[in-house]
Amino acid sequence: MSNIIKAIEDAQLKQDLPKFSPGDTVIVQVKVKEGERERLQAFEGVVIAIRNRGLHSAFTVRKISNGEGVERTFQTHSPIVNSIEVKRRGAVRRAKLYYLRERSGKSARIKEKLAKK
């Protein structure tokens, strides 16, 4: 029985996702339906958490909008998520960056990860 469920879930996984980790700045293109039309809306921010659960994987992105912190959680393999683009790689030493919620300004900055030679 579990083999059937696994086969169905594997068929629904997205294959074209970039590798990203907490601390990375990403641009998530989200499909938004307004009345009859459907358009793409970009949500750019820092990945503060990733939850790896196969088809049920999710990640949380945080950005500052008009001086107010905004967090949005996306299902990684959802059809609503059109694309994910990694804008910059961040060097962090934690898996969950919830401490960024209490910080603002310069203390909330994340160092950029240097490329390996």
Swiss-Prot record:
Q: Does the keyword Ribosomal protein apply?
A: yes
Q: What does the record give as the function of this protein?
A: This protein is located at the 30S-50S ribosomal subunit interface and may play a role in the structure and function of the aminoacyl-tRNA binding site.
Task: Recite the UniProt keywords alphabetically.
Answer: Ribonucleoprotein, Ribosomal protein
Family recorded in the similarity comment: Belongs to the bacterial ribosomal protein bL19 family.
Listed GO CC annotations: cytosolic large ribosomal subunit
On whether Cell membrane is a keyword of this UniProt record, the answer is: no
Question: Per UniProt, what is the name of the gene that codes for the protein in this document?
Answer: rplS
Please provide the Gene Ontology terms (biological process) for this protein: translation
- What InterPro entries does UniProt report for this protein, alphabetically? Ribosomal_bL19 (IPR001857), Ribosomal_bL19_CS (IPR018257), Ribosomal_bL19_sf (IPR038657), Translation_prot_SH3-like_sf (IPR008991)
| Recorded superkingdom | Bacteria
What is the protein named? Answer: Large ribosomal subunit protein bL19
Q: From the Swiss-Prot or TrEMBL record, what is one GO molecular function term? A: structural constituent of ribosome
